[in-house]
UniProtKB/Swiss-Prot annotation:
GO terms for molecular function: aminoacyl-tRNA deacylase activity; ATP binding; proline-tRNA ligase activity. This is Proline--tRNA ligase. Homodimer. GO terms for biological process: prolyl-tRNA aminoacylation. Consists of three domains: the N-terminal catalytic domain, the editing domain and the C-terminal anticodon-binding domain. Catalyzes the attachment of proline to tRNA(Pro) in a two-step reaction: proline is first activated by ATP to form Pro-AMP and then transferred to the acceptor end of tRNA(Pro). As ProRS can inadvertently accommodate and process non-cognate amino acids such as alanine and cysteine, to avoid such errors it has two additional distinct editing activities against alanine. One activity is designated as 'pretransfer' editing and involves the tRNA(Pro)-independent hydrolysis of activated Ala-AMP. It is an enzyme of class 6 (ligase).
Amino acid sequence: MITRMSELFLRTLRDDPADAEVASHKLLIRAGYIRPVAPGLYSWLPLGLRVLRNIERVIRDEMNAIGGQEILFPALLPRAPYETTNRWTQYGDSVFRLKDRRGNDYLLGPTHEELFTLTVKGEYSSYKDFPLTLYQIQTKYRDEARPRAGILRAREFVMKDSYSFDIDAAGLKAAYHAHREAYQRIFDRLQVRYVIVSAVSGAMGGSASEEFLAESPSGEDAFVRCLESGYAANVEAVVTARPDTLPIDGLPEAVVHDTGDTPTIASLVAWANEADLGRTVTAADTLKNVLIKVRQPGGDTELLAIGVPGDREVDDKRLGAALEPADYALLDDDDFAKHPFLVKGYIGPKALRENNVRYLVDPRIVDGTSWITGADQPGRHVVGLVAGRDFTADGTIEAAEVREGDPSPDGAGPLVMARGIEIGHIFQLGSKYTDAFTADVLGEDGKPVRLTMGSYGIGVSRLVAVVAEQHHDELGLRWPSTVAPFDVHLVIANKDAQARAGATALAADLDRLGVEVLLDDRQASPGVKFKDAELLGMPWIVVVGRGWADGVVELRDRFSGQTRELVAGASLATDIAAAVTG
């Protein structure tokens, strides 16, 4: 196929968009692959759509290879199935809801577990029909509070979501591993650098869960890994290494001190080191109690106290994952006014217990550990408050931040921090959705068997940005051959009529060899054409320029930057095709 740039719907930009934060956002707009419509909404222009379709093709190849069958559901979905699973409420403000002219409720689908489950239930009734894997590549919608980074976090996006249905746990495990391996092949073919990390299931439900994260310093997802063992996990899924309990006998009694104006950890530590407590005090010796209000879907709001060592901050993502599917918010001044026993900056376990406030603490706060914490009165703290003797929490919670150097949960060494972009997520859902819809089939013994499910997603449109994020330089995009809009960008950098005719003939020869060609036949200067060729990022650039008169053309490798001259003879197209496919 030959596409002439003189006919292509394309306009490149020389300057970065003012609101673009990351490289992929800047380059995809500058190169004319996408255009913004509204916050979180983008149009796909011809070049961008070709990249998107190439990625879809790779995904279809690998999904079909593991026995997946493609279907397509509507994006506009009725309320009833989501009420059955309680996700109509759980999703809160993150979905787009609307009513038809008769007042019936609908949403724009964020995911389709309910529809897949109901469809399989309606079509199949025997164990003989399984195992089964269905998938779709479809536009999804989420009302992101802060869409950012172009198509990396948009309100409308393309996803591949697949679902496996099996009659037992062994079948689910096999389907899960088949998808895991298929995802590795997909991302390898797309030349994406990625890591597989343990993850939490969130609103999806289920048990085993892993994320595929594309390594990127601009990624929203923090993850950790242990270089000694290969352990890797999203920060939400990291389990804190719980220390051993300590003996309580012989520890000094807790003492309340007047600490003055010390509402912060820093001011409390400063006081402690001036108070001659007989030791040097650090923030790690203090117990910070954070109050939040929690609301379960469709339920009432309750107070919850989170206790963490004073040298740690509460991580919003870890806290949110631990409380899923509940919503939460920090207490404001009005909340403190309603609960006068909560003295801001001086909250301790005593008032929490006396007022029946649920209290969850970091796993490091084990019996026998001694703490400096609030005494529930302005300007007063208690020193030497011992867990298991002076206070007992209602449980533990993984809410404190994870840090570089923390011990790996497997005990093999320290954790190293990194950032990534989520490109895939696989879950062993189990029977969460088949329970909700009583999706049973007759087993081999004639008795009902409850189906078990797996859920597997890939961010298709996000992958366009991820590949651009990982494959670019200061000149522009550098698409891997698997996803590039065209195999070769053929630049006519010579106004001579014979050179133009030769370039056009070369394009036709390449086309006959199955090479897709973008032919820059515009009446523009060579400098403009070269800049556009580098910006657009085809893996190979062929230049028909001044050397044509001497029987020579240039072949440039966009990745390595290397240029070599080829003889413009009978084998020219074959030589270029060999380089492109080799």
